[in-house]
């Protein structure tokens, strides 16, 4: 499923960043959802919780911005904008 792959990629990137910096866990992340990503904020949160289970990102608080501009060149993408780490 396209949505699952997008969310899984974000979880991988978040966890990779946490591991590379020696963080104990991820406390939060800011994510931007393109208008054509086929994800609502609620749907993204649900998938993130499932994909992040048993990872350093489990329980991370998500701040999600949803674009409404289908003409945006990144409208089909999900962008990880920032990550909060507990080091």
Model-derived features with residue positions:
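N-terminal, polar/charged subdomain of small-to-medium soluble alpha/beta proteins
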Residues: 1-87
């Amino acid at each position: 499923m396209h949505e699952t792959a997008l969310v899984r990629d974000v979880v991988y990137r978040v966890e990779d960043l946490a591991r590379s910096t020696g963080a104990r866990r991820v406390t939060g992340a800011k994510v931007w959802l393109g208008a054509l990503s086929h994800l609502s904020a609620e749907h993204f949160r649900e998938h993130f919780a499932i994909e992040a289970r048993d990872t350093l990102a489990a329980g991370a608080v998500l701040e999600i911005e949803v674009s409404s501009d289908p003409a945006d060149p990144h409208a089909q993408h999900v962008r990880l904008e920032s990550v909060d780490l507990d080091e």
